[in-house]
From Swiss-Prot:
It comes from the Eukaryota. The lineage of its organism: Eukaryota, Fungi, Dikarya, Ascomycota, Pezizomycotina. Pfam families: Gal80p_C-like (PF22685), GFO_IDH_MocA (PF01408). Keywords: Glycoprotein, Oxidoreductase, Signal. InterPro entries: Gal80p-like_C, Gfo/Idh/MocA-like_OxRdtase_N, Gfo/Idh/MocA_oxidoreduct, NAD(P)-bd_dom_sf. This is Dehydrogenase aclE. Residues 1-19 form the signal peptide. Dehydrogenase; part of the gene cluster that mediates the biosynthesis of aspirochlorine (or antibiotic A30641), an unusual halogenated spiro compound with distinctive antifungal properties due to selective inhibition of protein biosynthesis, and which is also active against bacteria, viruses, and murine tumor cells. The non-ribosomal peptide synthetase (NRPS) aclP is responsible the formation of the diketopiperazine (DKP) core from the condensation of 2 phenylalanine residues. GO terms for molecular function: nucleotide binding; oxidoreductase activity. Its EC number is 1.-.-.-. It is an enzyme of class 1 (oxidoreductase). SUPFAM superfamilies: Glyceraldehyde-3-phosphate dehydrogenase-like, C-terminal domain, NAD(P)-binding Rossmann-fold domains. Glycans are attached at N330. Belongs to the Gfo/Idh/MocA family.
Amino acid sequence: MSKRIRLGIVGLSADPSHCTNYIHKIPLTTTPLKEKYEITAVSMSSPEKAEAAAIAHGLPRERGYHSVESLAKDPDVDLVVVSVKVPRRAELAMAAIEAGKDVYVEWPFASNLAAAEALAQRARERQVKSMVGLPTRLAPQVLKMKEILRSGSLGRILATNLLVTDDLFLKFHADKRHSHDKTNGANIVTIAGGHLLDAMAFLLGEFTTLHAHTSMLFPKPVLCDTDGNLKTGQFNDSPDTFTMHGKIGISEVPVSVCMYSHPPTTPNLFQWVITGEKGSLKMEGPSLMIHAIPPKLMMTSFGSETVCWEEISLENTIVSGAEYQAWLDNDTERIVTLDEAVVRYRMVDAILRSAESGQCTSYRYD
């Protein structure tokens, strides 16, 4: 067996219910990826948590670090994975880069465009490889849509529209309250918008012009304690709703986006339609997290007596750890580097600037 890539995961705690366990450890240890990767170190915020995490994941106690600097200096770590709350991602990823280690950091990885640009620049200077966690573009449904679009079977693309309604940003656990402080850059625009609009740009090209509006419908959101009990939240100054229209790609296809939060009194909905002259595609499901909770993919075609949506059968509806496979394959189309992710931050910045000014705007994506 060839040498496996050795991972040091920042934020992989002893708690098996923590999201880092689902996003990283499970696909790395329960799929064919386990033959290509191994977890050799973890890092947590205190010595006690670091030691507990190391023991929980079958590592020697000394492989539980309480600083990223120490983890990154470990000669048995090839790739540092940063999976912590948004406000600290850039700082911790920078520590790995300064140590000369390749880095995988989740999206969003910075609180603003300037911080994202600084991290990408330092990665270039240190000549390290990087990957940003934008797995929505790797969902089997999105890749199938790309295949169909490339085939030309839809004909000329006339428009695309995306509708997302979700209670996710109102029912965060109390430890996610940082998302309600706009300075942290962790809100419906950066998180839901960043992931889903990245997939849209992956299929159709970058937005050539956009006009956005954001609002805050719930200034005091509902939070849950660790037992799931509802409790009153702190005051919110982050947007919980945004809409956008504009044009996308070299053909300047009209685009409409609506993402809004609602209480759990209404079912969640994800719906994305790409309308073509010869046929159309529709993705529809119960969650905006389409890479984890799979939507149905449907297609219709022109020329039949009765036009209706027909579901497309996929061999797999979820591919756990798809970004890790892309890293192994050195798949430059599916891997999003820090430099490429800066373009997504420019898009987010343009959305927020447009919402503040009320004016149509654009961003640089060369």
